[in-house]
Amino acid sequence: MKQKTCAIQDSYDAVKFLNEIKNSADYKNAKSVLVNVFTERIQKDYISYITCSIKKILDKAKVSGLTCLQGFAQGDPVKGTTILTVFLFEKSEIDVLEFDFVKTPVEEAKKAFVNKMKNLKDLKAIQVYTTPLQNKITNDFLSSFNLEEADIPIFGAGAGFEAGSVPQKLLVFGNEVHKSGIVITFFRGKNLKVYAESTLGWTPVGKEMEVTEVIDNHILKTIDNILAGDIYKNYLGVTSSKNFLENTCEFPFMLRRSGKWLARIPIIKDENGCIHFTADIRKGEKLVFSYGAK
């Protein structure tokens, strides 16, 4: 597998980079190609133009992407640009499955996902891009297949947004652009090897607290039968819903699953005092505050 990344400022940069890829020996020798796109420009027309250009110039390519606060190129954050990362596989194969939850009923999407999983051979990894907060069913959707038991690494991201921005502007995209949806990329190959490592730069602190009530998988209502918003007031002195993310992001909750620590960063406190997350929280789990280890 070969990887090439470019930070582009406009569509001219994109076309130039894509043509360079097309004329390369790596592209000509590739069996399959994936282009991941990360963009700060929450403009459907711009995104559609970029994705159409990719598919027109690179006829082998599958596309997946999302809107985000900032992209990363060569491991460094890059502000004010769109990032294109091209993966070129000589022997492995790529499949992309996407659902728009405005158009497709959740149960129908779940069945299609499970059927796809059952029929894929030599599946080695899954990448997921989704619109957090837009579709409350994302976590439930992914749990329709036991990925841990199948020992298939899963990784990805949720579309990001600036603090105070309107969540409706979050977008993910594959063949189409979705305001409420999910784009799943399957990596397959008999000789493909994917090394997955879990790292977390947070250190747990304080006592464990039990999740006692959850709404829609990702809205925490009570902890130890105390309103979740009051927990932040009592321990961190955060009383206002305004700038809630900025005031709490340095002290995320941590929980253990399958022997590994996971972090849950609250992004919103609603008018009822409930705390919203972009990933699932389960009733009965033990939460503990944490702080940055470095």
Could you describe each region identified by the protein language model?
Residues M1-K55, A61, L66-C68, G75-A125, ...:
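Small-residue-enriched flexible segments
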